[in-house]
UniProtKB/Swiss-Prot annotation:
Cofactor(s) the record lists: Mg(2+); thiamine diphosphate
Repeat keyword on record: no
Enzyme class: transferase
GO biological process terms, semicolon-separated: 1-deoxy-D-xylulose 5-phosphate biosynthetic process; glyceraldehyde-3-phosphate metabolic process; terpenoid biosynthetic process; thiamine biosynthetic process
Record PROSITE patterns: TRANSKETOLASE_1, TRANSKETOLASE_2
Reactions that this protein is recorded to catalyse: D-glyceraldehyde 3-phosphate + pyruvate + H(+) = 1-deoxy-D-xylulose 5-phosphate + CO2
Lineage: Bacteria, Pseudomonadati, Pseudomonadota, Alphaproteobacteria, Hyphomicrobiales
Amino acids binding thiamine diphosphate: H79, A120, H121, S122, G152, A153, N180, Y290, E372
Subunit structure: Homodimer.
Cofactor note: Binds 1 Mg(2+) ion per subunit.
UniProt keyword annotation of Hydrolase present: no
Source organism: Bradyrhizobium sp. (strain ORS 278)
Name of the molecule in the record: 1-deoxy-D-xylulose-5-phosphate synthase
Enzyme Commission designation: 2.2.1.7
List of residues binding Mg(2+): D151, N180
Amino acid sequence: MTTFSKTPLLDTIKTPEDLRRLKVEQVRQVADELRQETIDAVSVTGGHFGAGLGVVELTTAIHYVFDTPRDRLIWDVGHQAYPHKILTGRRDRIRTLRTGGGLSGFTKRAESDYDPFGAAHSSTSISAGLGMAVARDLSGGKNNVIAVIGDGAMSAGMAYEAMNNAGAMNSRLIVILNDNDMSIAPPVGAMSAYLSRLYSGKTYRTLRDAAKQLGQHLPKVIANRASRVEEYSRGFMMDGGTLFEELGFYYVGPIDGHNLDHLLPVLKNVRDMETGPILVHVVTQKGKGYSPAEAAADKYHAVAKFDIATGTQAKAKPNAPAYQNVFGQSLVKEAEKDEKIVGITAAMPSGTGIDIFAKAFPKRTFDVGIAEQHAVTFAAGLAAEGYKPFCAIYSTFLQRGYDQIVHDVCIQSLPVRFAIDRAGLVGADGATHAGSFDNAYLGCLPNMVIMAASDEAELVHMVATQVAIDDRPSSVRYPRGEGRGVEMPEVGVALPIGKGRMIRQGKQVALLSFGTRLAECEKAADELAAHGLSASIADARFMKPLDEELVLKLARDHEILITIEEGSIGGFGSHVMQYLADQGMLDGGLKMRSMVLPDEFQDHDTPAAMYARAGLDAKGIVRKVFEVLGKDYAAEAVKLA
C-alpha cells in the first residue's frame, strides 16, 4: 500500500535556500505543512508549543524574503524557534528537542549558522541585533539584521534601552514585534494591511525623505508644522506606532501575522529600505492552527508529550508536591496571619507558586512583568515602608537584578525575602536556565541570610523563618520539580538563624550537605556503610550565617569532611573552607573536599543524568570518599559484589 507524505512540499526543503526557489503561490502550503510538522514533533518531545505555532507564517515569510543566514535573524527568548529549526536544516533532529545530545529548545550559536545569536532569557534581541548592525556598517557590509521580539519581552527595560540607542544611531536594523497577546495592537484588517504596504513602500519613503530634506531649507516654524502633520496623519491612520516613532524607529503595522498576502509584500519593502531602524508590528495568535492550544494558550505555552487528537498531555502523577506549590501554599498560610506579607513575581506566577498566593490575596500580589531589576527595587520600597515582600524569581533570572540586590537591598539591609526557585540544574532547558550561581553571587554580599531547603518540609519552615527575619534580607533556594514525599508539617516554625542539623552520626567521614543533595548523601552513607565506612550526615540549612559550631565539630571528629551542594565554585563549600582555614583546621590531618557543579555550562538532559555527570549523585559521593582515601572505587565495588 502506497503511503503519502503529509508534508510533500516541506520534504523538499533542507535549507531556506530551497524555500526561496519556490513560487510565491506555494509558500502558503509550506506554512501549513510546517505547522503540522511542528505539532507532530512537539507531541513526541514536549516543549514550548504555543509561541511556535503562532509564528509559522512569519517564520516562513522571513526565510522566503530574506537571505538567511547572510541576513542575520535573531529570535528573542527562542520559545518560538522550533519552526525556524525545521526550515534551517534541523528537521531530521527535531524529535530530539530538549533531550540529552539532541537539539536545544532555544537558539544556539553552536548548533547552526542560522542561529547567529543564542537566546533563552528575554529582551536581548534588539541589543544584539544593533551590535551586529553596527559591526556590519563598520565592515562595509550590506546584509540585513532582523530581530523578532514578542510583546511580553517588550515589558523589559533592556528592549527600550536598545531601541533608544538604535534610534539615536539611525542604524539600519529591522525589528519585528510579534504581538501575540493583543496587548499593544488595535484590530487589524484590510485597511491596516494596505496602509502598511503603502508606508513601507519605496515611493512613500522616498517622498518622505525628500520632504525631510526640503524641510531643512524651510523656516523652522513651517518645517515643524509640516513634520507634525505627517506624524499626526500616520498616527490617525496607524494607531499604535507613536511610541516607536518617538524612539526613532519607522513604524509599519499592525499587520496580520497569519496572512502571507500581507506579510510578504511588507517584508520585501522593509528588506529593500536602505536607511534607519524599522519596526514591523505583526499580530499573531498563540497556538494558531491547533484548536486546544488556541482555546487555552496558557496551558499550551509549554507542554509535556501529548495526544494530537485530544490535546491530552502525558503528565505523570506526582509522588510528592512540587516545590513551587509548597512555597505558594506556605506563603498563603503565613499571609493569613500577617497582613503585611505581599508576593512579587516577574512574569512567572505559576512557575514560582505565586499564582497560589494570588488566588488567596489578589490585592497583595504583584506581577511586574519581565522586569527583574524593577521587581527587586520595588520589593525594597515595600520593605522600607514596613511590608514583608516575598520576591519569587528563578535563580537564573535573579541574575538580571543583581545590582539592585546589592545597591537597593543589601547595602540598606532591607528585609526583602527572596524565594529562589529552579536552584541547581533544571534539565531540559539546559545551561541558560540552570540555577548554578546564586550561592556564589549572593554569598559574597554582607547582610544576606542564605538558606537552602533539603526537602519540602524544610521549605515550609524556611518560609516561616523568612517572615521572622525583619532586619535584613534573606533568601531560600529550592529546585525544580517534586519534593521527596516526606511528612509535611501543619504549620511552619521559624528556625534558629545560622544553625544546621545532624541527620546521622558516624565516625570516619562527614558529609555536609547544603540543599536537596541531602537525599543522595543518605544513599551514599548507606553504600559506604556496606564498605565498612561510617559516615555522619549533616544538613547545613544555612550558608550565611554559617553554623560554625557544627562545621568545627565535623572537622574535629572526622578524618574526612566533604561538602555537597547544587551550585558552582565559590559557593557553600568555599565558605566552609574559608572558615576552616581561618581557624587553622586545614593545617593538620583533616582531609577536606568540596563537591560542586563542574566549572562549565552543562547542556540539557534530565536532571538525574546531569547530576550524575557532575558527580553529585550517591555514586559520585562514594567515589569521592574512596578517592580521598586513595582507593579505587571500581575495585571496591567489585569486592562488595
